């Protein structure tokens, strides 16, 4: 089957937003106008096309990025719906990796909200071009100018409107296009009938002023345009469009549009802007990977059908009908269903059963995928999130995705024997889908422990076990992932010697332990001179230290951010062995625990709380009572925002407490920021508890 849409006419976009900015409704309307849906589903009734997992429908939030394909004005638009809740920022990061552009949706009353900032930062890290859609213009208190100002003040973004609304709240009735200086008026409720009219006289001055500001903002990124602008020359519509497109693609400028998805206004114009200003796979920098056989050698995956096949798996899902679905983005080359591919990340050969193009909750079988496409494959057994798929002769790895370690853990127990096996299967499948979710069995207690990125994250996973896998389980109290580290340096000896008839065991090491920089992890240095410890035993010393560090020295938590320098030791020709040196290294660590001033570290969360000013005193008091450190405050519209660092152990149940402190008017987001030392009195309690005292 030949290519249906050329690369120039392909757009891979994501829709990013704060939790209640109307992202899902916006996606819905895109699907409605591109002819993919016949009836519109409202999120607040729990029946949206993109939110296809039951939990999402219950909670009215979007959790998994479903990939949907739609067509508009002769172009293919692949939409990846990204989650808007901060516990799911890994999902967002993962989908940003495969996008070429994004639409950031703002609430016209609130402007840029805390979660918008988080997602915006991530998009900037990955260099994703964006356009901004100021949604909910029909809402009470909607203020377009204020929303645009928050882009400047809170995100320092070079953003300018390419549209202006006429009216707001109930009076919102038309949109002025500042590029072409036209006006569009909506004449029916479904927003399918649009009338192009002249810009009303009383709005002309405002429109001309806004157009001049737009040209000025774009001219900063284009020398040609700047010359014309300074020389008062006429700038044509096509020149302005091209300059906006260039600046947007280079992530130097962000066009701002307006509308209300719920009331069906402005969505088609936003789709036009996606086509006009967001890049095709040919316009963005080609992705650079490296050779599996030689990590130093860079390889470029060029958007070209005739190139070697290379794709990145960005999402794994379990579908009740077809089993495991692997969503992937093709960067170069083509692939047909039934063919074999290589998973270069894991070094395995995989057979692609069927290829599916996904609509939010229905699917269409296809024969071939081309570069720039996003599709799902059935039949890939070993491929996980972040793996590279490539042609059998190719051995490119498209930079591995690195995922943060879980910061919160819970114990889960099946309610009955029948649930036991089902729970094991469920946990395996959920870990395949979500690399930030970990499950293991505690060796000492035999309990199954699950770990994730926040309370909501784990709540939803437990909920999914119940709904999708019919597993009833009891959930224990949340546990924090503490760590341990050394605060001072020391030189210690670890000696293991055992004689019990026949061959003995002998290993002797002298190691200098010093604190490492925060976040630098464990570093091992071999400084042995003259072979006092033979070379073949050095890896055993390092392995022995790593094993011992896993169980810490104070309360059984992993020891992190430590340097170990092996500088002396001795061995025995007959009795020395790898095992003996492993044990000697662990004895050295025990010795270091007495001299290196070990401390317990706890995860500190960056918490952003937004609430009406009158609750400020209560909230500040509450943050302090949770051992929090306030890092700054700022007014945001008619609300106040408090930024603070608070230990995770003090944040359990915070949602309920914030609700009661602010009569339900406060919101907060939090994510892991760094590890910090635990106060002595609390550390003593943790040690006692872990020793069962």
Curated annotation (Swiss-Prot):
UniProt xrefs under CDD domains: EF-G (cd01886), EFG_III (cd16262), EFG_mtEFG1_IV (cd01434), EFG_mtEFG_C (cd03713), EFG_mtEFG_II (cd04088)
InterPro entries per UniProt: EFG_II, EFG_III, EFG_III/V, EFG_IV, EFG_V, EFG_V-like, EFTu-like_2, G_TR_CS
Residues that, per the record, bind GTP: 17-24, 81-85, 135-138
Molecular function GO terms recorded: GTP binding; GTPase activity; translation elongation factor activity
Major location (coarse): cytoplasm
Keyword Electron transport attached: no
GO biological process, one term: ribosome disassembly
SUPFAM superfamilies attached to this UniProt entry: EF-G C-terminal domain-like, P-loop containing nucleoside triphosphate hydrolases, Ribosomal protein S5 domain 2-like, Translation proteins
Domain of life: Bacteria
Keywords per UniProt: Cytoplasm, Elongation factor, GTP-binding, Nucleotide-binding, Protein biosynthesis
Pfam families: EFG_C (PF00679), EFG_III (PF14492), EFG_IV (PF03764), GTP_EFTU (PF00009), GTP_EFTU_D2 (PF03144)
UniProt-annotated location(s): Cytoplasm
The keyword Cytoplasm is annotated on this UniProt entry: yes
Annotated Gene Ontology cellular component terms: cytoplasm
PROSITE patterns: G_TR_1 (PS00301), G_TR_2 (PS51722)
Domain tr-type G residues, every copy: 8-282
Subunit structure: Has vitronectin-binding activity.
UniProt function note: Catalyzes the GTP-dependent ribosomal translocation step during translation elongation. During this step, the ribosome changes from the pre-translocational (PRE) to the post-translocational (POST) state as the newly formed A-site-bound peptidyl-tRNA and P-site-bound deacylated tRNA move to the P and E sites, respectively. Catalyzes the coordinated movement of the two tRNA molecules, the mRNA and conformational changes in the ribosome.
Family recorded in the similarity comment: Belongs to the TRAFAC class translation factor GTPase superfamily. Classic translation factor GTPase family. EF-G/EF-2 subfamily.
Name listed for the protein in its UniProt record: Elongation factor G
Provenance organism: Staphylococcus aureus
Gene giving rise to this polypeptide: fusA
């Amino acid at each position: 089957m030949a290519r249906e849409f050329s690369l120039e006419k392909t757009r891979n976009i994501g829709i990013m937003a704060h939790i209640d900015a109307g992202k899902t409704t916006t996606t819905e309307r895109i699907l409605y106008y591109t002819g993919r849906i016949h009836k519109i589903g409202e999120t607040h009734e729990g029946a949206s096309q993109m939110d296809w997992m039951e939990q999402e429908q219950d909670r009215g939030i979007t959790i998994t990025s479903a990939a949907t394909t739609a067509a508009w004005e002769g172009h293919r638009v692949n939409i990846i719906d990204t989650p808007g809740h901060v516990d799911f920022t890994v999902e967002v990061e993962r989908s940003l990796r495969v996008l070429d552009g994004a639409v950031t949706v703002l609430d016209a009353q609130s402007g840029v909200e805390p979660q918008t900032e988080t997602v915006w930062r991530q998009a900037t890290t990955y260099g994703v071009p964006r356009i901004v859609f100021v949604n909910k213009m029909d809402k009470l208190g909607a203020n377009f100018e204020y929303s645009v100002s928050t882009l400047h003040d809170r995100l320092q973004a070079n953003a300018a409107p390419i549209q202006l609304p006429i009216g707001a709240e109930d009076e919102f009735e038309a949109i002025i296009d500042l590029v072409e200086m036209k006006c569009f008026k909506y004449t029916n409720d479904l927003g399918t009938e649009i009338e192009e009219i002249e810009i009303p006289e009383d709005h002309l001055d405002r429109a001309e002023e806004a157009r001049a500001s737009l040209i000025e903002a774009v001219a900063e990124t284009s020398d040609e345009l700047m010359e014309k602008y300074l020389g008062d020359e006429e700038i044509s519509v096509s020149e302005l469009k091209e300059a906006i497109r260039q600046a947007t693609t280079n992530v130097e400028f962000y066009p701002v549009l307006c509308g209300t998805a719920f009331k069906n206004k402005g969505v088609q114009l936003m789709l036009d802007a996606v086509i006009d200003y967001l890049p095709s796979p040919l316009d963005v920098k080609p992705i650079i990977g490296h050779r599996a056989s030689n990590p130093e050698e860079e390889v470029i995956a060029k958007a070209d059908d005739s190139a070697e096949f290379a794709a990145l798996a960005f999402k794994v899902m379990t579908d009740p009908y077809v089993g495991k679905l692997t969503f992937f983005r093709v960067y170069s080359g083509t692939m047909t269903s039934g063919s074999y591919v290589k998973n270069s990340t894991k070094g395995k050969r995989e057979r692609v059963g069927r290829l599916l193009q996904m609509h939010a909750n229905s699917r269409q079988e296809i024969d071939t995928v081309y570069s720039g496409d996003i599709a799902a494959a059935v039949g890939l057994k070993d491929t996980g999130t972040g793996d590279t798929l490539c042609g059998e002769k190719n051995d490119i790895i498209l930079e591995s995705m690195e995922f943060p370690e879980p910061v919160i853990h819970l114990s889960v127990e099946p309610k009955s024997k029948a649930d036991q096996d089902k729970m094991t299967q469920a946990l395996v499948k959920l870990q395949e889908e979500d690399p930030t979710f970990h499950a293991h069995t505690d060796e000492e207690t035999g309990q199954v422990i699950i770990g994730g990125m926040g309370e909501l994250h784990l709540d939803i996973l437990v909920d999914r076990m119940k709904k999708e896998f019919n597993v009833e389980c009891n959930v224990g109290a949340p546990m924090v992932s503490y760590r341990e580290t050394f605060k001072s340096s020391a030189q210690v000896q670890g000696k293991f010697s055992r004689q019990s008839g026949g061959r003995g065991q002998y290993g002797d090491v002298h190691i200098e332990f010093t604190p490492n920089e925060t976040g630098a992890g464990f570093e091992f240095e071999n400084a042995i001179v003259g072979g006092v410890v033979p070379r073949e035993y050095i890896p055993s010393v390092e392995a022995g230290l790593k094993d011992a560090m896993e169980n810490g020295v104070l309360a059984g938590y992993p020891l992190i951010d430590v340097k170990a320098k092996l500088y002396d030791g001795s061995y025995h020709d007959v009795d020395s062995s790898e095992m003996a040196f492993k044990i000697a290294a662990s004895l050295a660590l025990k010795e270091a625990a007495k001299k290196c001033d070990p401390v317990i570290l706890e995860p500190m969360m960056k918490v952003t709380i937004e609430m009406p000013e009158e609750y400020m005193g209560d909230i500040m008091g509450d943050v302090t009572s949770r051992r929090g450190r306030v890092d700054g405050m700022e007014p945001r519209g008619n609300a106040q925002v408090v930024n603070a660092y608070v230990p995770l152990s003090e944040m359990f149940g915070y949602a309920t407490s914030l609700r009661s402190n602010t009569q339900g008017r406060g919101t907060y987001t939090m994510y892991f920021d760094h590890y910090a030392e635990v106060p002595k009195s609390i550390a003593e309690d943790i040690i006692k508890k872990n020793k069962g005292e």
